[in-house]
Amino acid sequence: IIGHDGRLSSLEIKNKLIDTFRRHGVDVVDISLIPTPVSYYATKKLDIPNLIMITGSHNPKEYNGLKIIIDNKPFFGEKIKSLNDLDDASLSTTLGQLTFKDVITPYTDEIISQFNNLDKLKIVWDLGNGAIAPIIHKIINSIKGTNIILNRSIDGNFPNHHPDPTIKKNITQISNYIKEKKFDLGIAFDGDGDRIGILDNKGELIYSDIIFLLLSLDLLKEKKDLVAIADVKCSKILFDTLKNNGVDIHMSKTGHSLIKEMISSKNADIAGEMSGHIFYNYKYYGYDDAIYASLKLINILNNTKKTLNELTSVYMKSSSTPEIKLYCDEKIKFSLLDKIVEDIPKHYDSGVDLITIDGVRLETENFWFLLRASNTQNCIVFRLEHFVKDKFKLEKKIGRDPKIATVIHESEVSKKACCRLSFLS
């Protein structure tokens, strides 16, 4: 199966892949321009275990890439490197067949059939000029209510804003609309529809780990022995709350492919990432689907008298940064992280927990911070959460903490990669 998103280079890449596969005897099913979650659905619906989805996801518009499924398992990392060892002599010269399949219609029908009477809310949807447009049009025609769509046309230039809904500057338009029109909810998607950004009734972006917490607690009502997974960037409030409610919660490395492997090994019911990937395995297929997750959230709000702001405020007991990306040369970012992991204990005495499953996450009684190398961009990701009752400027707090400042400024990252936090300069 081959599908593609709406980026400017995606169609050309798809056509070249199809031509190459067919020339070597591989039959291809073309599912055309489609969101990534629907391409995953195609492997289930068509009972074909192999998929290439051409997408740059939330990355800058000049980026592109391949999301690969082989034998119903994510194909990444060392598996990709192993392709160099294949013997070309074993390839067929018989021309493979090409067929075209519509999976948008069965996907949409199946999704809609699981939800009823989602008509109480006023919702604004920001499609970000991404590949998700055909799906959302069909869904809102079925769920009724008041629905407004922003940036509905598919355009790989992303003329209105960059397609990453977890970054505040990218959700200014939808935020203003919520405030001006008094809407209940804002839902924004990335370029290929597998990551979600949620805004509450006040137009405020709610971090995806808190949204995942709400969704997990809702699922707990139905599945009492819930097993959940959250990535290393997520709030400690999420982990503590789920654990205190009897959930078997596991911390994972960041990355949708890595989380899918862990879902399988732990037989998890639900999983989520700070970046907005949310995976439902209980009564669903186990892949990250922002469309399905958005309908689950709408269902929660549709069955309560509370606003989203009221539902989430009880968990907003900390001050935290978003993901802060520190530029780092691609060739050295992982080795530099190894050096940081080695150096950090020198700056802290007892009373700290070091979690090194993905970079380093240092936890104390009052705060935690994370430094990890991005899997998809030439940067190192930093996030900090501090538990205080009074709000303050987190940037200044970090700057006043000599230990954190030393870790950042005196590390090999700062010396060799010109990484810095703007508020520490």
Please provide the spans of the model-predicted regions.
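Proline/glycine-rich low-complexity loops and linkers
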Residues: 22, 82-109, 113, 201-274, ...
